[in-house]
Amino acid sequence: MAEEPQSVLQLPTSIAAGGEGLTDVSPETTTPEPPSSAAVSPGTEEPAGDTKKKIDILLKAVGDTPIMKTKKWAVERTRTIQGLIDFIKKFLKLVASEQLFIYVNQSFAPSPDQEVGTLYECFGSDGKLVLHYCKSQAWG
């Protein structure tokens, strides 16, 4: 039984060694490649576009900041940190004069014009970006 798989593995090698096998395979692979690449490109773009348009963000409260019941949110890649701050302030019904700080992975505060997609690419893990929010300065 061990000889049969070896001979099966050797057959493609011997076919590849012969020029006829490569010529026969080339038209067959050439014909499926354009449709598959055309099918893969839109297929890849559509799911990648869906997943890349929306990023999962896990929002965690720090200190005396009110805790959001919904912690996991799907946010567009192009949304800025300032947009998130405004959203969280409205969601928590904070006064406009109250400050809200956002930290990435409990380490640094990104700039308000930073896009969420860029932060996700650099600091995302397990398919999500963890952001901590608080009313007083905590880290960095």
Swiss-Prot record:
Entry comment on modification after translation: Acetylated by EP300.
One Pfam family it belongs to: APG12
CC per GO annotation: Atg12-Atg5-Atg16 complex; autophagosome; autophagosome membrane; cytosol; intracellular membrane-bounded organelle; nucleoplasm; phagocytic vesicle membrane; phagophore assembly site membrane
Comp. bias (Low complexity): 25-42
Induction: Expression is induced by mitochondrial DNA deletions, chloramphenicol and nicotinamide.
Function: Ubiquitin-like protein involved in autophagy vesicles formation. Conjugation with ATG5 through a ubiquitin-like conjugating system involving also ATG7 as an E1-like activating enzyme and ATG10 as an E2-like conjugating enzyme, is essential for its function. The ATG12-ATG5 conjugate acts as an E3-like enzyme which is required for lipidation of ATG8 family proteins and their association to the vesicle membranes.
Name this protein carries in UniProt: Ubiquitin-like protein ATG12
Organism of this sequence: Homo sapiens (Human)
